[in-house]
Amino acid sequence: MSCPVIELTQQLIRRPSLSPDDAGCQALLIERLQAIGFTVERMDFADTQNFWAWRGQGETLAFAGHTDVVPPGDADRWINPPFEPTIRDGMLFGRGAADMKGSLAAMVVAAERFVAQHPNHAGRLAFLITSDEEASAHNGTVKVVEALMARNERLDYCLVGEPSSIEVVGDVVKNGRRGSLTCNLTIHGVQGHVAYPHLADNPVHRAAPFLNELVAIEWDQGNEFFPATSMQIANIQAGTGSNNVIPGELFVQFNFRFSTELTDEMIKAQVLALLEKHQLRYTVEWWLSGQPFLTARGKLVDAVVNAVEHYNEIKPQLLTTGGTSDGRFIARMGAQVVELGPVNATIHKINECVNAADLQLLARMYQRIMEQLVA
């Protein structure tokens, strides 16, 4: 017997939606949602396709996700072409199977089943879908959220379908995320000949004590909801490639994943104070890609935990670990935000796959969440 969740996932995988190209995925989802009475508003910005869809009125539960995927890498290393979905030994292979076309299919099928059983549901059910989450994310969810906030749209609860699970569906639910702050730092020196160091000023030598002190800082100890803030140097570049030239500049890029114990301004102030302490000549640029957010126990978290316990008979861990997601933008609307999706073991990898039975289970969990919050 065919399964509508698997069939829709396969249809989505066949559309090679390399970010920010949607490749027809949203048209497919919109057709399904309009057929069950959703009003759909396309909200495209530049090269990114987005849509906001809703049905009903009142307290609002939105499901959020992205149709775009990362490049598949060397297609010859896949057991099957990455955009030709294949099921082997119960596993559905294809780029986007886990991140996150399987979740999108589960959301839509759950909505179809929910509406069939509750055609006059009490609350409002909504979808916020973008084609740019994996790349810059500049014209995706963040722009939709800004537009919705400008007209005072209501959003009480949001479930993001990112692959949150580790071993089985629902073993981990993300009820928050750390903030992300990147520093692009250039240390200025004076270029010269290595045989005449007194005529130059080596920025690598000057920066070494600063960097040594920077990496030794314990920024905080975290708290009951967040791990300790982490700082990692991601890129470092200097020199001309020649062994007889002292470089004139050193570029260092480092990233903070920070908890609610800190603010981005506190981090910036400490870094700048350290630069001044070491008397460095520098230019600095900051990129704040997301503030930390946390959804405490409440109606949404309780509904998600209930759905997982009902269908998988496990109590999920509530964690805030991992990278950023579009949940950071949606949280600005004051909504409770939680992430629940399939196992993430193969996301962005060659031979990305998801257990087909897990997607069926996920659709049932999503439907039960709808029933608890907007039926």
From Swiss-Prot:
Q: Outline what the protein does.
A: Catalyzes the hydrolysis of N-succinyl-L,L-diaminopimelic acid (SDAP), forming succinate and LL-2,6-diaminopimelate (DAP), an intermediate involved in the bacterial biosynthesis of lysine and meso-diaminopimelic acid, an essential component of bacterial cell walls.
**Protein's pathway:** Amino-acid biosynthesis; L-lysine biosynthesis via DAP pathway; LL-2,6-diaminopimelate from (S)-tetrahydrodipicolinate (succinylase route): step 3/3
Enzyme Commission number(s) of this protein: 3.5.1.18
Task: Please give the catalytic activity noted in the UniProt record.
Answer: N-succinyl-(2S,6S)-2,6-diaminopimelate + H2O = (2S,6S)-2,6-diaminopimelate + succinate
> What superkingdom heads the lineage?
Bacteria
Q: Which HAMAP family match?
A: DapE
What this protein is called in its record is Succinyl-diaminopimelate desuccinylase
Name the positions where Zn(2+) 2 binds.
D99, E134, H348
Q: Which cofactor does it need?
A: Zn(2+); Co(2+)
State whether it acts alone or in a complex, and with which partners, per the record: Homodimer.
Q: Which UniProt keywords apply?
A: Amino-acid biosynthesis, Cobalt, Diaminopimelate biosynthesis, Hydrolase, Lysine biosynthesis, Metal-binding, Zinc
